[in-house]
Amino acid sequence: MSSPTIPSRLYSLLFRRTSTFALTIAVGALFFERAFDQGADAIYEHINEGKLWKHIKHKYENKE
């Protein structure tokens, strides 16, 4: 008897039952959203370096 391959193992663990399939999709969407959002923010901040308020506010704050 041969050992199960990776795709068949994934199918049996994550996609065979509807409940685990839905949970897999929801968790995948959550992680994708977080990664995409952080990546987009990093790119935006890199492109606008020195133009955003958090980069220049030290010039305008009162030092007491």
Curated annotation (Swiss-Prot):
The processes (GO biological process) annotated in the record are:
cellular respiration; mitochondrial electron transport, ubiquinol to cytochrome c
What transmembrane ranges does the database entry give? Answer: 19-43
Entry keywords, A to Z: Electron transport, Membrane, Mitochondrion, Mitochondrion inner membrane, Respiratory chain, Transmembrane, Transmembrane helix, Transport
Show the InterPro entries listed in the entry.
QCR9 (IPR008027), QCR9_sf (IPR036656)
Q: Which residues lie on this side of the membrane: Mitochondrial matrix?
A: 2-18
GO CC terms of this entry: mitochondrial inner membrane; mitochondrion; respiratory chain complex III
Intervals, Mitochondrial intermembrane compartment: 44-63
Q: Name one Pfam family in it.
A: UCR_UQCRX_QCR9
Record's keyword annotation contains DNA-binding:
no
Q: Which PANTHER family match?
A: CYTOCHROME B-C1 COMPLEX SUBUNIT 9, UBIQUINOL-CYTOCHROME C REDUCTASE COMPLEX, SUBUNIT X
Protein name as it appears in the record: Cytochrome b-c1 complex subunit 9
Organism expressing this protein natively: Mus musculus
Q: What is the lineage of its organism?
A: Eukaryota, Metazoa, Chordata, Craniata, Vertebrata
